[in-house]
């Protein structure tokens, strides 16, 4: 195991040997339902990468609870349940959603008596109407397109065991779904997934990541992420051509080459720019970096030392 800055660099084979006591509690069909459109993951990936990760999270969860109990004893007050919040960051199309859903499923199996919930920060984007009013549609996904105050209130309420609700975002309509919310109420574990969860907004005195008990950054080379982004775009077109209400319908029934050309331009002018300027700089704030190579295979991990 190579030491690198303030991270341990751990190759896949070494990581997979850290914890082999439990068999993967998933079937192929269940795993298929958890993965995103064009993401690739196998039961072997779950066994080699995610089962050791769940064991590591269990160590942090136990430490989290022990700290809360000890601090309450020190203060002479009754111990309160404080939700454990796990943040998952990374570029568009890198596979964050699959990682988040898979961890939710595995943690629910490991902790059958605990409530494990998941939300994405997509729901805290301003609605398209508001983005247009602010002339921000071309900046959708950049820091200024999110209602960060609302997101901060949300995670603060969760930490304080107050009922909280997260707006729902639909990739089908490419907008916030009016009147729909994900209700989060007294979870034991909350997973917060999004490109912006480790960012440091310049106009805030407190950050979303201040509420995290553990954070993961899903990483890959730019060229691979672009490839996955374009693959996902084509998959969306393949599923949208029968649904006129789908945001991608006009592109699905139009000239495919022109649609792909447009997607490449969006990648270059928006997603790649956002990755380089605002997402990648947050990588070294994560507790764990999961690095992917071809076919979404995790080939190495970087675990923060302290």
Swiss-Prot record:
Swiss-Prot/TrEMBL catalytic activity: (R)-pantothenate + ATP = (R)-4'-phosphopantothenate + ADP + H(+)
**Pfam families annotated for this entry?**
PRK (PF00485)
Instruction: Describe which pathway this protein belongs to, using the record's wording.
Output: Cofactor biosynthesis; coenzyme A biosynthesis; CoA from (R)-pantothenate: step 1/5
Q: Which UniProt keywords apply?
A: ATP-binding, Coenzyme A biosynthesis, Cytoplasm, Kinase, Nucleotide-binding, Transferase
**Listed GO CC annotations:** cytoplasm
The catalytic activity of this protein is classed by the Enzyme Commission as 2.7.1.33
Provide a GO biological process annotation.
Answer: coenzyme A biosynthetic process
Q: Name one GO molecular function term.
A: pantothenate kinase activity
Which NCBIfam families does the protein's record reference?
Answer: panK_bact
Q: What is this protein called?
A: Pantothenate kinase
Gene encoding it? coaA
